[in-house]
Amino acid sequence: GHSSYALEDVTARYIFGKKLEGAEAVDALVKIFQEYLRVKEQDTLYKNLELPVAKVLAQMEFNGIEPDMELLDQLAEDMSFRIKKLEKTAIEQAGEDFNLKSPKQLGVVLFEHLGLPVIKKTKTGYSTDVKVLEELEGKHPLISTILEHRKLAKLQSTYIDGLKPLQNPKTGRIHTRFQQTVTVTGRLSSADPNMQNIPTRTEEGKQIRKVFVPGEGYDYLMSCDYSQVELRILACIAKDEVMLEGFKNDQDVHARTAAEVFGVPLEEVTAQMRSRAKAVNFGIVYGISDFGLSQQIKVSRSEAAGYIENYFARYTGVKQYMDGIVELARKQGYVTTLLGRRRYLPEIMHSNFNLRSFAERTAINTPIQGTAADIMKNAMVK
């Protein structure tokens, strides 16, 4: 099929009238794809960035990372105890026995027996997804218990029970797979396990991070990252003077945005203002709507629209960039990153509003997110 990357399927799609197998098929495909890359002006990116990065990733996969299995066992025991305790509490709060993992049973308990307001229905009954539960939080103590139970159960299945079988019996290490060709923006992803998405904000997440330790002969694990890389890229490609000035003066970018959006001096910015400005900053990068922002920061749609309007009034360069890049995408059918990676947007001229809007948001975001990936990969090679 068209979505399959198995050698026989790719060969069938690109080589007509010949039955080629194994190395012969690979050799023929290489010639076809090299020409395809040249025509699309992607050959330099491929040779100078993606191939060298592949070697770095191979070495990283080979090296792996060492887990402290004793700590993992200890966390597993603690997590199981806490989950069982929450299950007992939930049954007491509900006043009846039910399976917390069954959305159907939970729906009956919440909306029929406890009489909580129905937020959303699905084909099979009441919706009990996270958004629904968060909206109901505060209306009954059971809701908070269910949310905590779900959080811990996910951590348990993904990171505690999930990590044990992934330890290599020969090396004693966990060897994740880095995926270089999965995301359309050029970003790397990771699987088995996903080492790029281990939670850090919660206390439980921090404990899981402690499971990964320096191997024998090493004293510490080193972590490197770019500070606010996507917002810095936005400031640069949009040539926005206000945002550039903030970065040049090493200001807290979210506090600076709060001062601009709320019209207060920097020193008078509150924690709530900064939090909302942070949502605006990252939301703008992803082309967020007033409705999307209102849902995220729990304010009215008109208030969210006011924040976005104030943002564009102060950061005029960002607004000009967004309008300009969408127009460019309409003209040429694609957008590019700093190092020339292309993302084609066939839906940018679509008559369907939702498809067209998604393509427009993609046109805005790809040069930012993709350039961040280019910079990160370049640093890895160097």
Residue ranges and their predicted role:
Residues 203-208, 380-382:
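Short amphipathic beta-strand starts and helix->beta connectors
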Residues 62, 168-171, 175-176, 181-183, ...:
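Conserved catalytic core of nucleic-acid polymerases
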Residues 100, 246-248, 368:
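Conserved, non-catalytic sequence blocks in retroelement Pol enzymes and Pol-derived host proteins
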Residues 237:
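A small-molecule sensor/coupling module
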Residues 200-205, 251-255, 350-352:
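Flexible glycine/proline-rich, aromatic-decorated loop/lid segments
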